[in-house]
Amino acid sequence: VDEEQGVKPLEVVAAVIRDAQGRVLVAQRPIDKHQGGKWEFPGGKVEQGESRRSALGRELNEELGIEISSSKRLISIYHEYEDKSIYLDVYEVNHWGGEPSGCEGQPVKWVEVDELKTLDFPDANAPIIDAVCLPKLLKYLKPVATDGAFREQVNQSLEDGHKLLFHNYEEQPISHEQLNWLLDTAAEKKAEVVFQSPPPLVRNDYGIHLNHEALVKAHEKPAAQRVSASCYNPGELFKAQRLGVDFIILEPVLMNLFSTGHEALGWPMFQSLAARVNIPVYASGGVSEKDLELAREYGAQGIASTSLS
């Protein structure tokens, strides 16, 4: 197949390699290559007859001189440039042998996760950076009866290490004082809060979640620190992608939602739907923390649930 004519997308694999400090390894593309001079996540083309994980191991050995011992799926992306289209399969690598270096003369460096958004990457890498920055677990805050129980739940969630909390304001309205306390307390732990149907706020350090009705009505991405959306079908997934949301919650995966009439998707259908968009997708509906590794193999960013320790 003539890749230059765009007959078939170029299959590419890439690795998000993290060290013990949580830093990520990036490499600079040669000036004479496509998107030359920009930073990238190490990887390369999948050869004919080669599995993607085999290609990943080969490329990292050739480029960096390391032998990877394990990898986990992070995100898959389809992107069209003016001169070619690519299908990019991205894996997280946390365990390897050897010391990474630029074996082909390319500059490489370790960067903090927060620094990734300041570097010049090819356009196709934007969803990868989003996926790297997002946690694997999204914690739904449960409706509770008292202010004390509300604060206890928030404090416990943050103490457990959760970095992304979800509060449904429609389901449990809270006072402005509680709302500001929630955001301040989360910020102290470097965590984010996403609200569904929040009241008008004078601050901007929070996220907005679009439920089904809000997604259908939306004509542009709301102004917020982060925007997410709930989706049940391909049409809603594509609408969320057109709006440019930062992540999607796709449901229900393992349980029927009788209140909305939606039947459980199951993991194969979840994988098929999630693969249609270039956005991190969380699995929700009947799933818990024990399903995390399975969810990731099926293409999920992670799990969204109340059932998280």
What residue ranges belong to the model's regions?
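Conserved N-terminal beta-strand and adjoining loop/helix that marks the start
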Residues: 2-24, 76
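Conserved Nudix-box catalytic region and its N-terminal flanking loop in Nudix hydrolases
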Residues: 23-63, 194
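Nudix hydrolase/Nudix homology domain
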Residues: 38, 101-153, 160-162
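Active-site-adjacent beta-strand/loop module that shapes the phosphate/pyrophosphate-binding cleft
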Residues: 77-99, 109
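Alpha-helix-loop-beta-strand connector modules within alpha/beta enzyme cores
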Residues: 178-195, 221-233, 261-283
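Catalytic cores of alpha/beta
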Residues: 193-208, 232-244, 276-283, 287-306
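Glycine/Thr-rich beta-alpha phosphate-binding loop at enzyme active sites
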Residues: 204-214, 226-275
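Glycine-rich phosphate-binding active-site loops on the catalytic face of alpha/beta enzymes
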Residues: 212-220, 247-261, 287-309
